[in-house]
Design a protein with these regions (language model features):
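N-terminal lobe/hinge region of extracytoplasmic solute-binding protein
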Residues: 41-92, 123, 188-189
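Gly/Pro-rich hinge or "lid" segments in bacterial periplasmic/extracellular proteins
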Residues: 75, 79, 165-217, 221
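Surface-exposed binding/hinge segments that line
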Residues: 93-96, 100, 135-177, 197
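Alpha-helical secondary-structure segments
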Residues: 114-121, 149-155, 191-192, 219-221, ...
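Ligand-site clamp/hinge motif
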Residues: 181, 210-255, 382
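Structural transition elements
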Residues: 309, 313-346, 364-367
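Extracytoplasmic/peripheral linker and loop segments enriched in polar/acidic and small residues
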Residues: 382-393, 417-480, 502
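Long beta-strand-rich cores associated with HINT superfamily self-processing modules
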Residues: 475-502
């Protein structure tokens, strides 16, 4: 597998059981007349506007499916459905994919979404300016060809379950080839919305694409408003300044929205593994006994209760329950402080160990950090807690790897392969794990599931990290907003399902 210099982890495998795939488009949630403006509260601002060249889940959250479209997309159940492609076929040898584009599809400029546009977009995603995460998604691809105006043929150098799934995310976005400006300041997509403006630190504004080729945008304007203080975000929804909070980051406040005449609360699942990550180049953390000791020393049930109001599922490895290869591995390291102390003694740290814990200033980071400081102190581990703004976390932790331990929610779908990347920020190298992922990607559907289960168990046994819990999806909306989805299983906050009851 290719190495990666920088990655915020995306997408792994999709079991393919099709030779021809064609589905209907997402249903219109209703015929309501759209209100003029939709105000959305969130806490994770984009790091930039170009999904091909910047890392950070906040960018795709706003732009994917809304401004930029893909040949295929994920619906709220995690199923792959057509978007710009009407359908696709796969050859018997699993090496050739043929996509037929929707003849109605066009960019906001009015230009048609042509096969040449798709080829140019995919080649850009394979180029040197793309993040290594994006380029790695295209590693199995040999050639990309436009055989006519509406047909794209992609050949692979090896079979890959992962590759088609990648097309549903940022690696698969299609951009207008006629655009010669700066993707970091303007948009050139085919989605129902266009980028309008960005007041950094406060607001990203989208406007309706009046020339949209599909179901028209139901809002003239969408404002993603960003709050560092979750209490302030809650207050904005309660006072009517917001129409929706994408994910309630103070679950203990859910009772504030119990008036069903004013609000609707939607609880579902995410891909967001809250990971206590280890820098495996740290001398102490390079030792299995130390990593296992930390896993034994943490009472994850108590952590979820104390920091996330008991809402959060224990998983035990880098696999959410929505993936076909999920196994509950949460009891691999039951809470056992005496066992933790024994392992630390074996590793040579009987007299104590000091580590830096650097966390992002997101809702979960500081509170979980404080919990861990107190709990690990009970087994002789001193944590020096350092809270960073998310941009600084990306710089110091994710890019420069200046940390010992960190906490972050990896929200990307099917992101097991982050642990197989040579140059990822937690510096984990395990050839047996890498081989299992390669065998899963090129094997049969049954082999894929079996190999990925084995890989997840290997990660857990090796204590490659401590998977604290899986974030729930708790979306709270004004009662006048319909079409709110329970689950968040892609990187997008898909506006196409939302409408106003007014």
């Amino acid at each position: 597998m290719r190495t990666a210099r920088r990655w915020v982890g995306l997408l792994l495998t999709l079991a393919l059981a099709l030779s021809v795939a064609a589905c209907t488009r997402p249903a219109d949630p209703g015929g309501e007349e759209p209100q003029r403006v939709l105000n959305i509260g969130d806490n994770l601002e984009p790091e930039g506007l170009d999904m091909i060249t910047v890392s950070g889940a906040g960018t795709a959250y706003v732009l994917l499916y809304n401004v930029y479209e893909t040949l295929l997309k994920l619906n709220s159940e995690g199923e792959t459905i057509p978007l710009l492609a009407q359908g696709w076929t796969r050859s018997d040898d699993l090496l050739t994919y043929t996509f037929t584009l929707d003849p109605k599809a066009k960019f906001a400029s009015g230009a048609p979404v042509s096969a040449d546009a798709v080829v140019a977009s995919f080649e850009r995603a394979r180029g040197e300016k793309a993040t290594n995460q994006i380029r790695s998604a295209w590693a199995p691809v040999d050639t990309i060809t436009a055989t006519d105006a509406k047909t794209v043929v992609v050949t692979l150098s090896r079979p890959s379950h992962q590759w088609l799934y990648e097309l549903t995310g940022p690696a698969g976005i299609v951009t207008d080839p006629a655009y010669t400006g700066d993707f970091s300041t303007e948009s050139a997509g085919s989605g129902p919305y266009e980028f309008s403006s960005w007041d950094q630190g406060s607001l990203v504004q989208l406007k309706a694409n009046e020339a949209y080729w599909g179901t028209p945008a139901r809002f003239d304007e969408v404002n993603f408003r960003y709050y560092a203080d979750p209490n302030a975000m809650n207050a904005a929804l309660l006072s009517g300044q917001l129409d929706l909070i994408t994910n309630l980051t103070l679950p203990q406040t859910i009772s504030e929205f119990s008036d069903t005449s004013r609000f609707s609360v939607h609880e579902g699942v995410t891909n967001g593994e809250v990971v206590l990550g280890f820098n495996h180049e740290n001398e102490a953390l390079s030792k299995l006994e130390v990593r296992q000791a930390i896993n034994y020393a943490i009472d994850r049930k108590a952590l979820v209760k104390a920091t996330w109001a008991g809402r959060g599922e224990l998983i035990g490895s880098m696999v959410p329950p929505t993936d076909p290869w999920f196994e509950d591995l949460s009891n691999t390291y039951p809470f056992d402080q005496e066992k933790a102390k024994e392992l630390l003694k074996e590793a040579g740290y009987e007299k104590g160990l000091t580590l830096r814990l650097r966390v992002p200033a997101l809702a979960y980071g500081p509170s979980i950090g404080r919990f861990l400081v107190a709990q690990l102190a009970e087994v002789g581990i001193t944590l020096e807690l350092d809270t960073l703004q998310f941009a600084d976390w990306l710089d110091f932790v994710f890019t420069k790897r200046d940390y010992d331990m960190t906490i972050v929610a990896h929200v990307e779908p099917r992101d097991m392969r982050t642990f197989a990347l040579d140059d990822y920020y937690w510096n984990y190298h395990n050839e047996a794990y890498r081989k299992l992922l390669e065998e899963a990607d090129t094997g049969t559907d049954e082999e894929q599931i079996a190999k990925l289960k084995e890989a997840a168990r290997l990660l857990a046994d090796d204590a490659a990290a401590d998977w604290l819990f899986l974030l729930p999806n708790i979306t709270v909306a004004s009662a006048k907003i319909s079409g709110v989805q329970d689950n968040r299983v892609s990187l997008a906050f898909d506006l196409t399902t939302l409408a106003s009851r007014d």
